[in-house]
């Protein structure tokens, strides 16, 4: 079994999954506020080449906040 570890990756290394789900108008501002207040509580789940499997709203909120790096778990 592969050991999972949290890494910090630059946001420009990431890209949303091909079949994007729509982020609701309410979800993004709420996530921006949560990241601003508490930071990342749950890392993004990404593939080795940076495709986001889980965490698109967190990713978009990080872009809004102009974060340079985000925590990820590589699946």
Can you say where each PLM-predicted feature lies in the sequence?
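Short, charged/polar connector segments at secondary-structure boundaries
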Residues: 1-75
């Amino acid at each position: 079994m592969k050991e999972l570890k949290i890494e910090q990756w630059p946001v420009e290394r990431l890209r949303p999954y091909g079949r994007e789900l729509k982020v609701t108008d309410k979800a993004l501002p709420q996530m921006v506020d949560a990241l601003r207040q508490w930071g990342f509580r749950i890392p993004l789940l990404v593939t080795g080449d940076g495709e986001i499997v889980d965490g698109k709203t967190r990713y978009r909120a990080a872009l809004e906040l102009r974060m340079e790096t985000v925590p990820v778990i590589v699946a």
